């Protein structure tokens, strides 16, 4: 599963990555099945690699976040503003919000489908099983979940978590942790 959330096999859940930079790959070509078969012939172990919470490539405006899953993308506190991660073009990876129950269920279904489809792989490598960084996720959903978990009301959102501005409202070069950051 690529950083775009597209997969290299025919899936009933995730979109198929049938082309990249002009190179087309037919839907009936199962790249992983080929690697498993040929790798086993050579006596190799074969692992599948899945980028779990990655949902798009910001340099190409491509991926599930750019298709029908825009609501699942992380909201970042970027340079003093709440910004959808797809709008931060200096960040190539468009991450989804790991705390969103819809995102979690979708990813679990992709992983279960993969495990059913390829039981003969020797293992799985999971990448991007995380938030994009300390500046993500600042969505209303994450705020609500944080308040419930911590048992607090965040009065000055986002500054009580993280601040880009000094006490005079001037933008800092780097963020500073707020009173609720842990």
Regions found by a protein language model. Give the residues of each.
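Aromatic- and acidic-residue-enriched segments that line the glycan-binding/catalytic groove
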Residues: 6-20, 54-90, 129-173
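The substrate-binding groove and active-site-proximal loops of carbohydrate-active enzymes
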Residues: 13-29, 89-108, 174-182
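Arginine residue identity/basic-tract feature
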Residues: 25-27, 45, 62, 112, ...
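Active-site-adjacent "subsite" loops/lids of carbohydrate-active enzymes
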Residues: 31, 36-37, 47-118
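Aromatic-lined substrate-binding rim segments of carbohydrate-active enzymes
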Residues: 3-54, 181-182
